[in-house]
Amino acid sequence: MFRGLSSWLGLQQPVAGGGQPNGDAPPEQPSETVAESAEEELQQAGDQELLHQAKDFGNYLFNFASAATKKITESVAETAQTIKKSVEEGKIDGIIDKTIIGDFQKEQKKFVEEQHTKKSEAAVPPWVDTNDEETIQQQILALSADKRNFLRDPPAGVQFNFDFDQMYPVALVMLQEDELLSKMRFALVPKLVKEEVFWRNYFYRVSLIKQSAQLTALAAQQQAAGKEEKSNGREQDLPLAEAVRPKTPPVVIKSQLKTQEDEEEISTSPGVSEFVSDAFDACNLNQEDLRKEMEQLVLDKKQEETAVLEEDSADWEKELQQELQEYEVVTESEKRDENWDKEIEKMLQEEN
């Protein structure tokens, strides 16, 4: 066995031809020495092998530790760079979401969404509880037919307070009620206008429609109240009007007074006959003209009496104003009559 091992290690060369070695060859070493040297060589080879394996394992551990350290360093540096970049850009929501503050914000957001849901359930269209719901509803629904109602901002200087969060539930209700509004929103937002601006312009025009309806209703109420007060005042003033109003038309009384004054003036004038007809005969005036003038006077008096009767059906204020005008007219007519009488007297005096 040792011989085969020594031959494997190259310690002994076989002799060619199986002959005896030459006489000059050194004497053969003892087998025990060969075995010991072989064992030493095997031990040295095993030690070297173990040393080599230990070196390889140490190198492997060193390389692994170096690679792990490098990866950890790179990961820490990358994380630090990401945090720095997020802080600079303000995108720290992802980091905050992983903390207690993030959990609190999630709960708060959930609570706000629940409140929005409750408001949406309680929200109603803008035309509810108005005076004329049907008319206002038609006018509001007609706004969705023209996109200018959503693109044009309120005029400059107009104070229109719009809270998007507060009106958001109403907007959701209107999207359900008005299909054309939903299509208009899909076509305009966000291509031509922002979401908040879209609803601001829309609800501004809705408020104009509601204000117009309120003003119309208020004007109608004031008009009805004024008519009622007027009728009540007329009923209250009716007894006083009956007491103050003369039993006979004022024109008739004035005509009688005017006749008496004419008679007095004619009777006191010198050289004048007792009656006006005598005076006309004395002057040789045209009887036809005189008759026409008298008829005209009668017609004028009848017209005045008819006007007075028509004025009796008007209200008290108009009657008072009309009576004042009649007094002025009578005064002017009296002045004309006086001038006419003076002319007659002058003519009679010239004839005499």
Curated annotation (Swiss-Prot):
What are the residue boundaries of the BSD domain, all occurrences included? 158-210
- Show the InterPro entries listed in the entry: BSD_dom (IPR005607), BSD_dom_sf (IPR035925), BSD_domain-containing (IPR051494)
Phosphothreonine (modified residue): where?
Answer: T248
Q: Which SUPFAM superfamilies match?
A: BSD domain-like
Tissue distribution of the protein: Expressed in heart, placenta, lung, liver, skeletal muscle, kidney and pancreas.
Looking at the record, which segments are called Disordered?
Answer: 1-45
Function as written in the Swiss-Prot or TrEMBL entry:
Plays a role in adipocyte differentiation by promoting mTORC2-mediated phosphorylation of AKT1 at 'Ser-473' after growth factor stimulation.
Entry's Gene Ontology BP terms: cell differentiation; cellular response to epidermal growth factor stimulus; cellular response to insulin stimulus; cellular response to insulin-like growth factor stimulus; cellular response to platelet-derived growth factor stimulus; positive regulation of fat cell differentiation; positive regulation of protein serine/threonine kinase activity; regulation of short-term neuronal synaptic plasticity
Q: How does it assemble?
A: Interacts (via phosphorylated form and BSD domain) with AKT1; this interaction is enhanced in a mTORC2-mediated manner in response to epidermal growth factor (EGF) stimulation and activates AKT1.
Q: List GO terms (cellular component aspect).
A: axon; cytoplasm; cytoplasmic side of plasma membrane; cytosol; dendrite; extracellular exosome; Golgi apparatus; growth cone
- Keywords of this protein's UniProt record, alphabetized? Cell membrane, Cell projection, Cytoplasm, Differentiation, Golgi apparatus, Membrane, Phosphoprotein, Postsynaptic cell membrane, Synapse
From the Swiss-Prot or TrEMBL record, give the protein name. Answer: Synapse-associated protein 1
Principal location: cytoplasm
- Which domain of life does this protein belong to? Eukaryota
Looking up Pfam families in the UniProt record yields: BSD
Mark the residues carrying the PTM Phosphoserine: S269, S313
